[in-house]
């Protein structure tokens, strides 16, 4: 039975295919026979997709609008010409005295048409037709039909007493006789609105059949009215014959127009399809160009996806599919031989003009070249850089390496978060702070993205404590019955830990924390975190740069700093910030988590460490690649990968000075470039070759570097975050980045502006920016 069913099914399918082939061979329409492939609904004639039908009408209207003056002039000339012909014919045959009502209607009809034409043109009729085209079309047809029938009955009523007794077929068509002198063409005047209707309103829409029906009714009305008037002297069969002839003629015209219109629509569909493909291709190319870099792991992911797509592609032949899959698998095997799966290909980087950007974010060490020996070997450092990059990429992809601070050596019953100091020390320490419990918090809104931290009379140094208090009190302190004094004590101690360096200071930390709060509430992550996890995340943001002394990881590696020895070249600064933060939290007078149990404290500590370590720019590409591969969109995926989402959020907030208004953005850039150049001056004194980012002498290229940074790092990061966005925050960020990028581009093209802005970046520098700070090693005292 089963086999019989299959045979019947395949037999029917074969028969269907055969019929389809015949239809395709003899079809006038040249459309697919498969119902799923058809793009046109044949009755009423329209595209199946509403968007395509709308676009078709818009294109028709736009085409008419571009020729509106030609249409206006041609219709006015045609109307006035027919009007003049009717007047001349009437005067020649002395018809004014006989056909008074007819000529009254002639003048009225002409005036109405002229007013209608001018009104439509004056009111931009094309734009109205785009939205209410169907209603206008039907209304206009009904109006014409009423006017035409009125014309017809008045005409025949005027001349019925003048009609000949014997009527032959040759004189039948309009039968507008006057004293048997001449056939007049007054009847043709009624067809003029139809001519106007075809050209001024797009009849090639789903209402076009109404025109053909009207045309047929007009012809039938002519013959029927004449028959009723001349019933005594005219044969009924002749009238029926003329009506049938009119019907056949109308159907023939309709079918021809119908076929032509289908072909036009198919041509439009092909054009529209190709246009969409070109736009999609351009968009894809643009997105690919804007990508930071395709890492090897992303390449593997894309190749596997491509292979799966080829396997399910029914249009491809089996051999082509097999070859494509095998080719992709060979590429994957070759990529897997590389060590740097989460890093961009170094060969690709070197081909680009912005390899110094990647050199910075990947901590690629530049040549250590002593001034006295400038012509030394230059190949060994390159090898060292490459090996260092490979070594960096060997880190596990699941969880970042967690380096315990030295304060963990002596562990008590609770972790360092719950470490208790003596009561006397606690009392003495608290007395050191002058708590302002009534601090003004109204002038900072935690919900507004564009807060002016720098673009004001003086920088907002109070923002750190104000923002920290508002957010931590909102999400945690108010629910845990913890003393506000402990919160203030923590915030004051953290603020005291920030040095007054140009960029990585407490104001930067306040901005990052505020933007983290906005992002986490605007993205689809806010309801996943518990109160204590939210507090830990905010503490991470507040302390992500604590103790920063205005130098980068690259500097610490080059100079063999003490911190490099402690943290083995792995995220040196970020581990230092973690240690500094936990050193503060280990004291009970600062510990807002002291009511949490040991297991919770361990989890919160791990969250803080992973979030702060994510701000290391050498991990930028890796984190972005992991996020892209996971394609986090569904809430269940977000819950499983919440740490990865938090890493992306703090990274976006850490670079958010690029996502604000130009005036604020420019001031942050000024601080950052001066901090970098200060490091470059220090490196130069020590005899190291400089990356262009830190070279004061390469300042003329700074704008190009800044544009590259925005395009290659910031834009891809924010664009990837859009998958989590449940509001419009990422769109706002992208618009600011693009505006700032455009502003830098315009400045670079104008030499006068370029020189002005470059000079402004390095002038009016406060003396406090020139102070050299050192890491606080007291946090490591046991």
UniProtKB/Swiss-Prot annotation:
Compartment annotation: Membrane; Endoplasmic reticulum membrane
Compositionally biased region (Acidic residues): 381-390
Protein's membrane topology: Multi-pass membrane protein
Binding site for a divalent metal cation 1: 508, 544-545, 654
Binding-site residues, a nucleoside 3',5'-cyclic phosphate: 504-508, 545, 654, 706
Annotated PDEase domain residues: 423-751
Catalysis performed (reactions): 3',5'-cyclic GMP + H2O = GMP + H(+)
Family (UniProt): Belongs to the cyclic nucleotide phosphodiesterase family.
Functional note: Specifically hydrolyzes the second messenger cGMP, which is a key regulator of many important physiological processes. Probably by regulating cGMP levels, required for sporozoite motility and invasion of the mosquito salivary glands.
Protein's UniProt name: cGMP-specific 3',5'-cyclic phosphodiesterase gamma
Originating species: Plasmodium yoelii
Higher taxonomy: Eukaryota, Sar, Alveolata, Apicomplexa, Aconoidasida
């Amino acid at each position: 039975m089963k086999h019989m069913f299959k045979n019947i099914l395949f037999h029917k399918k074969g028969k269907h295919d055969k019929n389809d082939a015949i239809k395709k061979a003899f079809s006038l329409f040249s459309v697919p026979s498969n119902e799923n492939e058809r793009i046109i609904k044949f009755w009423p004639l329209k595209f199946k997709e509403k968007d395509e039908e709308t676009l078709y009408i818009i294109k028709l209207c736009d085409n008419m609008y571009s020729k509106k003056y030609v249409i206006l002039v041609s219709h006015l000339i045609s109307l006035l010409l027919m009007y003049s012909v009717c007047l001349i014919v009437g005067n020649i045959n002395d018809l004014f005295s006989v056909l008074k009502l007819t000529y009254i209607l002639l003048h009225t009809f002409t005036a109405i048409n002229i007013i209608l034409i001018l009104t439509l043109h004056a009111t931009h009729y094309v734009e109205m037709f785009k939205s209410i085209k169907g209603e206008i079309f039907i209304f206009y047809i009904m109006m014409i039909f009423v006017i035409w029938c009125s014309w017809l009955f008045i005409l025949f009523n005027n001349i019925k007493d003048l009609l000949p007794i014997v009527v032959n077929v040759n004189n039948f068509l309009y039968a507008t006789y006057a004293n048997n002198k001449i056939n007049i063409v007054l009847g043709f005047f009624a067809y003029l609105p139809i001519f106007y209707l075809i050209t001024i309103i797009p009849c090639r829409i789903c209402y076009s059949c109404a025109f053909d029906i009207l045309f047929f009714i007009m012809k039938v009305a002519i013959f029927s009215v004449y028959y009723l008037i001349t019933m005594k002297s005219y044969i009924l069969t002749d009238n029926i014959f003329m009506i049938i002839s009119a019907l056949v003629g109308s159907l023939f015209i309709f079918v021809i127009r119908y076929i032509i219109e289908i072909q036009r629509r198919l041509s439009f569909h092909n054009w529209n399809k190709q246009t969409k493909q070109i736009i999609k291709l351009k968009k894809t190319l643009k997105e690919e160009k804007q990508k930071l870099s395709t890492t090897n792991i992303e390449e593997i992911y894309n190749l596997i996806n491509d292979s799966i797509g080829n396997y399910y592609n029914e249009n491809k032949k089996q051999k082509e599919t097999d070859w494509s899959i095998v080719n992709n698998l060979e590429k994957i095997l070759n990529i897997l031989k590389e060590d740097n799966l989460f890093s961009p290909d170094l060969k690709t980087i070197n081909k680009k003009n912005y390899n110094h950007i990647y050199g910075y974010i990947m901590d690629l060490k530049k040549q250590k070249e002593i001034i006295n020996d400038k012509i030394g070997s230059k190949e060994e450092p390159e090898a060292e850089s490459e090996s260092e990059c490979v070594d960096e990429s060997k880190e596990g992809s699941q969880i970042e390496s967690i380096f315990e601070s030295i304060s963990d050596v002596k562990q008590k019953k609770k972790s360092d978060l719950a470490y208790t100091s003596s009561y006397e020390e606690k009392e003495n320490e608290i007395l050191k702070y002058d708590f302002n419990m009534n601090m003004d918090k109204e002038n900072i809104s935690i919900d507004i993205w564009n807060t002016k931290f720098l673009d004001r009379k003086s920088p907002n140094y109070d923002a750190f404590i104000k923002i920290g208090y508002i957010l931590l009190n909102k999400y945690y302190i108010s629910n845990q019955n913890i003393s506000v004094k402990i919160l203030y004590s923590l915030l004051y101690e953290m603020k005291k830990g920030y040095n007054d360096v140009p960029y990585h200071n407490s104001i930067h930390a306040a901005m990052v924390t505020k933007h983290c709060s906005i992002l986490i509430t605007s993205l689809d992550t806010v309801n996943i975190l518990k109160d204590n996890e939210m507090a830990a995340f905010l503490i991470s943001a507040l302390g992500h740069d604590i103790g920063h002394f205005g130098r980068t990881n690259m500097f610490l590696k080059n100079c063999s700093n003490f911190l490099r020895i402690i943290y083995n070249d792995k995220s040196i600064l970020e581990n230092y910030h973690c240690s500094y933060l936990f050193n503060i939290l280990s004291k009970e007078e600062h510990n807002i988590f002291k009511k949490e149990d040991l297991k919770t404290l361990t989890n919160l500590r791990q969250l803080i460490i992973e979030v702060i370590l994510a701000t290391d720019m050498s991990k930028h590409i890796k984190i972005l690649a992991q996020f892209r591969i996971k394609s986090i969109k569904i809430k269940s995926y977000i819950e499983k990968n919440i740490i990865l989402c938090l890493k992306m959020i703090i990274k976006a907030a850490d670079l958010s000075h690029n996502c604000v208004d130009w005036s604020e953005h420019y001031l942050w850039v000024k601080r950052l470039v001066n901090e970098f150049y200060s490091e470059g001056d220090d490196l130069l004194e020590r005899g190291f070759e400089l990356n262009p980012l830190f070279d004061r002498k390469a300042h003329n290229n700074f704008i190009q570097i800044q544009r590259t940074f925005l395009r290659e790092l910031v834009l891809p990061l924010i664009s990837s975050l859009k998958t989590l966005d449940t509001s419009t925050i990422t769109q706002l960020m992208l618009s600011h980045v693009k505006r700032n990028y455009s502003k830098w581009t315009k400045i670079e093209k104008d030499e006068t502006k370029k020189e002005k802005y470059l000079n402004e970046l390095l002038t009016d520098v406060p003396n406090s920016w020139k102070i050299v700070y050192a890491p606080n090693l007291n946090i490591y005292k046991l």
